[in-house]
């Protein structure tokens, strides 16, 4: 088993701070603090920040340091609409190649997602991981590596918003149902409806996000408290 490098460890740690909201959009990422927490030197942290900047999660400001990138509604719209087309295109390609065994693998991932469909931080992170595996599986079957890389980049840029939206039962349930319907349509070999459902799934997530400014502005409550808010009139 390959040992995780210091740069990879720092990258994973910083990304999780951003995703879970411990580091807010516009907040400075202090190299000394990260290095101290991980008990490593600053160069690996600096290299990790360079990588995260390239992935669109961090921005560097001259003589000021690194900051969590801030997004506008236009940024969100651009990312989600592009993501919807990439995911639908991947599924369209995959429909020509997918096997019954691979459909069973997708079903298993959906079952695991359902088992983790709870508004607790550790469950949301598990749901996110399974969600990503589901779409990576489809893109791998599609056989287009460039498409896979583009989608992975977009996923990272909006992962923190995905984490926040999945803290609401309504959206968590809807996401799980979308994936179940997509697998059912794949099994039925209904290419047109499967691709449409894939687009609808991504665009539904965008609509939910933009209709909840508390999430978009990173002022949303902790996942464990969101159920109560979701039930308010």
PLM feature spans:
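Short linear motifs at protein or domain termini
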Residues: 1-96, 214-233
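Residue-level recognition of short, well-ordered coil/turn positions
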Residues: 22, 57, 121, 190-191
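Conserved amphipathic alpha-helical segments that form helical-bundle/coiled-coil interaction surfaces
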Residues: 97-164, 174-185, 192-207
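Solvent-exposed loop and edge beta-strand segments that line ligand/cofactor-binding
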Residues: 167-171
């Amino acid at each position: 088993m390959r040992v995780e490098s210091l740069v990879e460890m720092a990258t994973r740690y910083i990304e999780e701070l951003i995703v879970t909201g411990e580091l807010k959009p516009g907040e400075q990422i202090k190299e000394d603090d990260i290095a101290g927490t991980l008990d490593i030197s600053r160069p690996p942290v600096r290299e990790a920040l360079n990588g995260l900047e390239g992935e669109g999660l961090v921005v560097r400001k001259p003589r000021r340091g690194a900051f969590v990138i801030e997004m506008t509604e236009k940024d969100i719209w651009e990312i989600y609409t592009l993501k919807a087309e990439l995911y639908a295109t991947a599924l369209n390609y995959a429909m020509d190649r997918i096997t019954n065994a691979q459909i069973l693998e997708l079903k298993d991932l959906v079952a695991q997602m359902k088992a983790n469909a709870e508004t607790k931080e550790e469950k949301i992170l598990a749901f996110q991981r399974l969600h990503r595996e589901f779409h990576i599986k489809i893109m791998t079957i599609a056989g287009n590596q460039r498409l896979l890389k583009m989608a992975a980049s977009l996923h990272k840029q909006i992962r923190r918003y995905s984490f926040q939206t999945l803290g609401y039962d309504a959206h968590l349930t809807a996401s799980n149902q979308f994936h179940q319907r997509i697998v059912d349509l794949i099994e039925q070999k209904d290419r047109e409806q499967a691709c449409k459902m894939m687009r609808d799934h991504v665009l539904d997530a965008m609509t939910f996000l933009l209709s909840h400014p508390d999430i978009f502005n990173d002022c949303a409550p902790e996942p464990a408290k969101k159920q109560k808010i979701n039930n308010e009139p």
